[in-house]
């Protein structure tokens, strides 16, 4: 964890520079999503067609296809529903790492065209407006950005408008981003104006806010330090369809219901039973058929905290989940990194689908027949290739989390948070931890055919 203090500064990015970077980002996102986007005539876009007919401004983003097996995970797993989903991915924001000054790793154009402002420079009015709006914490200013840019071109989360005058106005110097401003770091934890009870309440609320970020930091660290498991062969998809004689129908039998199975039920059963399942992904277990649970070498019932020891760098679903982890930082993460993460997630999903028992060839997917020796070798080769490709992206995401938390939160809270999410000194949190705050979802369990995490909490004595 980075622990040095950050001197407040105003970083200004010229309008031409940030608009070019934002346009390039949107184009890259569109290129990646285009095969999965629905045409405007699709029923799912009915609301957008109506607004267009009423001559309201409507951008040209449409919803992802909910039956496209390569893209529908973005909807089902990560909530990128409707046209709002792709639009969310297409929004741009500057890299907070600019605020650290040294060793900037961001869009080269933004780095070269940005400048550090002080009250003595010609643009003193912009400096004063930015310092006032940021409560003296500074930030990154996108020159001449407007309110109309928010929600379309730029992220709304964390955006601070800088009015031209003393009063609030639609006329702006630009828009400022700084996670420290968004999380009220300008209010000291030892504020003398607050009584002791109010201070403790605020600390607890901040710990609740920090907990998910610290959790994902721990997951990224533990995954990077893990040994890969390269003999799982994507059998989680097969375990979802496992249906031996006398067993109840698998609850996930309707999953990917628009696709036909490319193999028989008997082949599915034989493949799952051959050597069992070696699935380390705790989120996948809940979708297993109940009969497949005992066949998992890592357990038929897992706790969320088990993710810290089980998540490993060979897991295709762990690669996909980098998108979930990155989305938590949107507004405060390098947009170039988000595109790279999306590209990785889609590549992982394609391998996931191609190795499944479904026939997805109608959507441009190939077949990795893991029910055969040749197919298992093919899967392993692809898995290793993808793992090596993901490694630097996962490291960049971990760095983005550490930079974000360094800027956004008081260091003493980060140290306290480290103690109970497994990130400090190798300590692994348990159900009976006496830490100051543990999110309820961390104290939950997953079982085949079981309830969602938040509805399956571990009973504590």
Residue ranges and their predicted role:
Residues 223-230, 294, 329-333, 348-355, ...:
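Short secondary-structure junctions and interdomain/linker hinges
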């Amino acid at each position: 964890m980075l622990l040095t203090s950050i001197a407040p500064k105003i970083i200004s990015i010229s309008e031409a520079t940030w608009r070019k970077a934002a346009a390039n980002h949107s184009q890259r996102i569109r290129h990646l999503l285009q095969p999965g986007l629905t045409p405007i005539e699709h029923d799912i876009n009915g609301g957008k067609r109506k607004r267009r007919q009423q001559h309201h401004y409507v951008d040209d983003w449409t919803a992802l296809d909910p039956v496209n097996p390569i893209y529908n995970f973005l909807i089902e797993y990560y909530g990128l529903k409707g046209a709002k989903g792709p639009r969310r991915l297409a929004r741009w924001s500057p890299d907070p790492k600019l605020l650290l000054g040294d060793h900037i790793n961001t869009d080269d154009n933004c780095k070269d065209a940005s400048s550090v402002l002080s009250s003595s420079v010609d643009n003193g009015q912009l400096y004063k407006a930015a310092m006032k709006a940021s409560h003296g914490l500074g930030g990154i200013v996108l020159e001449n950005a407007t309110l109309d840019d928010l929600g379309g071109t730029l992220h709304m989360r964390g955006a601070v408008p800088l009015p031209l005058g003393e009063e609030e106005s639609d006329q702006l110097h630009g828009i400022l981003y700084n996670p420290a401003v968004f999380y009220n770091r300008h209010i000291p934890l030892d504020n003398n104006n607050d009584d002791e009870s109010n201070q403790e309440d605020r600390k607890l609320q901040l710990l609740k806010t920090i907990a998910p970020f610290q959790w994902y930091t721990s997951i990224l660290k533990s995954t990077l330090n893990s040994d890969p498991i390269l003999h799982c062969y994507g059998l989680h998809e097969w375990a979802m369809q496992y249906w031996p004689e006398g067993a109840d129908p698998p609850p996930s039998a309707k999953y990917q219901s628009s696709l036909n199975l490319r193999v028989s039920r008997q082949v599915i059963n034989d493949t799952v039973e051959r050597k069992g399942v070696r699935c380390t992904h705790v989120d996948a277990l809940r979708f297993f058929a109940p009969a497949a649970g005992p066949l998992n070498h890592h357990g038929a019932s897992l706790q969320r905290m088990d993710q810290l020891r089980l998540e490993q760098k060979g897991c295709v679903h762990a690669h996909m989940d980098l998108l979930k982890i990155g989305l938590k930082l949107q507004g405060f993460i390098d947009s170039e990194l988000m595109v790279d993460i999306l590209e990785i997630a889609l590549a992982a999903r394609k391998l996931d689908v191609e190795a499944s028992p479904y026939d997805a060839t109608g959507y441009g997917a190939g077949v990795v027949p893991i029910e055969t020796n040749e197919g298992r070798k093919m899967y392993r080769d692809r898995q290793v290739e993808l793992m090596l490709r993901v490694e630097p992206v996962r490291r960049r995401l971990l760095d983005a989390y550490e930079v974000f938390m360094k800027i956004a939160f008081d260091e003493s809270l980060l140290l306290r948070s480290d103690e109970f999410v497994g990130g400090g000194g190798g300590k692994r949190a348990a159900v009976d931890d006496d830490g100051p705050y543990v999110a309820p979802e961390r104290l939950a369990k997953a079982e085949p055919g079981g309830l969602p995490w938040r509805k399956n909490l571990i009973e504590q004595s």
